[in-house]
Amino acid sequence: PTPIGLFTITQKDAWGEGFGSRWMRLSVPWGVYGIHGTNKPWSIGSFESGGCIRMHNIHVEQVYEWVKIGTKVFIVGGVDGPFTFGLYPLTQGSKGSDVMEIQKRLSGHGFYNGPIDGIYGYNTREAVIAFQKAHGLNPSGNVDTFTYEKLGIILFE
């Protein structure tokens, strides 16, 4: 899915291959994501990409001229933010906006002091275990339904 949060344009390029005529890379720490054109304009608005933001080439070329490296980009999800597509079990190796939100919550509760980078590594797992133990949950190190609930993450209906 498309990463959710505040990012920065870190690279600009005029490509022309499968990414359309222009590319603007976002500072997403867990992967390569960007805003770009497309050679398949009929795919815009559908779930066709790996999380990038696709635009018609004529529009991305216009935006490309306005945007400088360092420009902030704020990507907003639905009412459930990074959990728009549901609460999925998270384990070591998971990556994404949902992991970033877990890291923020654990940090806010005093269990995590590592980077808020959306990468579920060893330190995130250890923080989850400590949080689970402190709240009487099974200390599996995986974020499950009960852990989401104790972290205050409950989806709207």
Regions found by a protein language model. Give the residues of each.
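Short acidic, glycine/proline-rich loop/turn micro-motifs
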Residues: 38, 45-47, 85-88
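Short, structured beta-strand/loop micro-motifs enriched in basic residues and often containing a Trp
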Residues: 50-57
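Residue-level detector of conserved, well-ordered beta-strand and adjacent loop positions
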Residues: 10, 36, 76, 91, ...
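Gly/Pro-biased beta-strand-loop elements
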Residues: 1-44, 57-69
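Sec/Tat-exported extracytoplasmic proteins
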Residues: 11-13, 28, 63-67, 71, ...
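Short acidic, glycine/serine/threonine-rich helix-capping segments at coil-helix boundaries
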Residues: 90-100, 104-153
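N-terminal targeting pre-sequences for secretion and organelle import
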Residues: 61-105, 129
